[in-house]
Amino acid sequence: MSGEGKKHGSNVEPLRPTRPCPECGRPSVRERYPFCSERCRNVDLNRWLSGSYAIPVADDESKADDEDR
């Protein structure tokens, strides 16, 4: 009976499906999601810190018009 519990417990469903790593395309791993390795994770972090990635900001022209008056 104790052998059945171990067999059933070893078949755990992952919380999320594996997806391709955004850096290299290999399957992601749970510990470093959405990346496949620490290297790919650090490459992405370096791009954010160096300014390679930027979030576009749209100027709100209605506020600019109000400030001019």
From Swiss-Prot:
It comes from the Bacteria. InterPro entries: DNA_gyrase_inhibitor_YacG, Znf_NHR/GATA. GO terms for biological process: regulation of DNA-templated transcription. Zn(2+) binds at C21, C24, C36, C40. The keyword Metal-binding applies. Binds 1 zinc ion. Keywords: Metal-binding, Zinc. Its cofactor is Zn(2+). Residues 1-28 are annotated as: Disordered. One of its GO terms (molecular function) is DNA topoisomerase type II (double strand cut, ATP-hydrolyzing) inhibitor activity. Interacts with GyrB. Belongs to the DNA gyrase inhibitor YacG family. Inhibits all the catalytic activities of DNA gyrase by preventing its interaction with DNA. Acts by binding directly to the C-terminal domain of GyrB, which probably disrupts DNA binding by the gyrase. PANTHER family: DNA GYRASE INHIBITOR YACG. This is DNA gyrase inhibitor YacG. It comes from Sinorhizobium fredii (strain NBRC 101917 / NGR234). The lineage of its organism: Bacteria, Pseudomonadati, Pseudomonadota, Alphaproteobacteria, Hyphomicrobiales. The gene is yacG.
